[in-house]
A protein has these predicted regions:
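Structural motif corresponding to the intra-repeat A-B loop/turn of tetratricopeptide repeats
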Residues: 45, 82, 115-116, 171, ...
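Short solvent-exposed coil/turn linkers within tandem alpha-helical repeat scaffolds
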Residues: 61-69, 97-104, 133-144, 151-156, ...
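"A position-specific structural signal for the A-helix of alpha-solenoid helical repeats
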Residues: 40, 74, 107, 163-167, ...
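N-terminal leader/linker segments that initiate helical-solenoid repeat arrays
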Residues: 18-74, 83-86, 90, 98, ...
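TPR/TPR-like (Sel1-like) alpha-helical repeat modules
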Residues: 97, 113-137, 223, 238, ...
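Terminal, low-structured helical/coil segments at or just beyond the last alpha-helical repeat
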Residues: 25-30, 277-282, 330, 335-376
């Protein structure tokens, strides 16, 4: 049985996470010296071209100065403003060799993301996250407002390190997308961006000839609020004829989708529609799971709840109609409840009218139930 989740790729436009001002200057300088004058001017300059000129001048004259890392970051920032992405990466690589700097790594990552460069994005995402986590991983609470600001800044930089992998993955070829998402999973298995890329990632695994890894990956990713991975895991277990797991994953997916916080940049209406689609699909898997167990009462309830939101997915809709036909027939027959049996007939007939794997059997079932009802 194939996966029926292809129609559930819910990808909103990526929303760039905000990042606060750069980290503080961890050095002291004398503004009366030639190098101090450049540093002072660089700290006050807002024009990208002037910042680039000042940064290049300083690094050419004072490459071993204790402020060289900070200056390199200012130079990278100016080059970013000029969209000189290759030069940003060149400066960053040289600066990194002389000592890791969080701002320098962050600006290099922004350049790599702007280029959609897979290898550079992976490299600088890892370096950016490592530098940020040296600050966020401290056991000591912030001593003052400045330390709190630095901590918040580091958290946002670390978040951007995940965002960079995510946004480049969305534009990558299947093998590269798989590589980038695998890197993101390793970097943070609970990343807020994994639900956004989950279905695209599972499809990319198949396109890359690694479809056999999709179900294990979904089970691994089905944590926290990742409703998309939970639904894929439910689908895997449905195809594997494991009803208990189908119902369990579906319930978790419904809970995750219902309680997920709204993303920035998404309208209330769009967010409500996306959540409804996820919950509706979760209801579908709950219903088919109960049908597998021949628990037709709960199946009937879940599948009816699913219908309005899965109508756009013809494959799921036809199966839901078929299982509703079966549930209502089986609920009505032992009681001699012809009204409920006719309800089952109606669902079988609707399913029979839809092209797909259920069509022939739905048509046969409809004829049998109709005959049992006396042809009317």
């Amino acid at each position: 049985m194939k996966s029926y989740l292809a129609g559930l790729v819910l990808l909103a436009l990526p929303c760039v996470p905000p990042v606060l001002a750069q980290e503080k200057q961890n050095f002291v300088f004398n503004p009366s010296t030639p190098e101090g004058q450049i540093l002072q001017a660089l700290g006050q300059e807002t024009d990208d071209a002037h910042r680039v000129s000042l940064g290049q001048d300083f690094l050419a004259k004072y490459p071993k100065h204790e402020a060289a890392g900070w200056v390199a970051a200012q130079l990278e920032s100016g080059l970013l403003g000029q969209k000189e992405y290759d030069k940003v990466l060149e400066v960053a690589e040289t600066a990194y060799a002389n000592g890791p700097d969080m701002d320098g790594a962050y600006f290099a990552l922004k350049a790599a993301v702007a280029k959609n460069d897979v290898e550079q994005t992976k490299k600088w995402s890892a370096r950016t996250s490592e530098a940020a986590r040296k600050i966020t991983g401290s056991a000591k609470p912030p001593a003052d407002d400045e330390a709190k600001h630095e901590l918040e800044y580091a958290k946002e930089v670390d978040e951007y390190s995940e965002y960079g992998l995510y946004v480049v993955a969305l534009k990558a070829q299947p093998k590269e997308e798989v590589d980038l998402v695998d890197t993101l999973i390793k970097q943070n298995p609970k990343s807020q961006y994994l639900p956004e890329v989950a279905n695209s990632y599972f499809a990319a695994l198949s396109k890359a000839g690694e479809g056999g890894k999709a179900c294990p990956a979904a089970a691994k990713m089905a944590v926290d609020k990742n409703a998309e991975a939970m639904l894929y895991a439910a689908d895997c277990n449905w195809r594997g004829n494991k009803a208990d797991a189908v119902i369990s994953y579906a319930a978790k997916a419904a809970e995750a989708a219902s309680t997920r916080a709204k993303r920035e940049g998404v309208s209330d209406g769009d967010w409500a529609a996306q959540k409804a689609a996820l919950v509706g699909t979760a209801n579908f898997y709950t219903g088919v799971g109960y049908t597998m167990q021949q628990r037709f009462g709960p199946a009937n309830k879940a599948l009816k709840a699913a219908l309005p939101t899965i109508k756009g997915n013809q494959s799921l809709y036809a199966i839901a109609l078929f299982d509703l036909g079966l549930a209502n027939y089986q609920l009505g027959k032992p009681l001699g409840d012809k009204a409920q049996m006719r309800e089952g007939l109606k669902y079988f007939q609707e399913s029979a009218g839809m092209a797909g794997p259920m069509q022939d059997q739905a048509s046969r079932n409809a004829k049998l139930v109709l005959a049992e009802l006396g042809g009317k």
